Amino acid sequence: MENRKILIVNTLDGGQYSAELESLLQEKEAEFKIINSDAMNISHCVGCNHCWLKTPGVCVFNDDYLLILKELVTSDEYWVVSDTSFGFLSSRGKRVFDRLMPLLLMYLELSEEGLMRHKLRYGRSIDVGIVFKGDGNREYLQRWCQRTALNLAGKPLGVFDVNEIKEAVSCM
């Protein structure tokens, strides 16, 4: 069986837990890339729809997110390691999800489950997982992860506290 390509974006200060993730994934002989985004310049999505209408597949912001987007185009799994705020992902964590829009088309379709989702720009689904630090509302994060995976025509891989990092890696 061919290894799936795993992209992990770690938004925590100083790339906390990246070394542990790397060690566990090397033991598993997984194909992966970890991007520590804490010092990267990543703008918020402003919902301008340029990536759909004016410059298809290209965000209007020419910032460091382009490095993540280039990796995502060929990835099978997208994992985000994020701090939490008010039970949800921190602004850094939410930002790296919001900027996924260039991977999608503005057109909608029904999924096999009968739910609406955007059509994929590159015809490639991406499975989604979250590792959170802090007081995350796991139930809400799981539901949000499911909806995000659905929009990427992928599967939710799970939502894990940083203390469950081994369990998260077992799902990668």
Where do the protein language model's features map onto the residues?
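N-terminal beta1-alpha1-beta2 submodule of the flavodoxin-like/Rossmannoid cofactor-binding fold
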Residues: M1-Y78, S82, F86-L105, D161-M172
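Short hydrophobic beta-strand segments
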Residues: I6-V9, D127-G134
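Short, glycine/serine-rich, charged loops/turns that create anion-binding
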Residues: L12-D13, D135-N137
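A generic local structural motif
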Residues: D64-L67, G114-H118
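A generic structural motif
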Residues: T84-S85, G134-G136
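Short, acidic/small-residue loops that bind anionic groups at enzyme active sites
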Residues: L100-L115, G154-V159
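Short, conserved loop/helix-junction motifs that constitute active-site signature segments
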Residues: H118-S125
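Glycine-rich phosphate/pyrophosphate-binding loop and the adjoining helix
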Residues: G136-M172
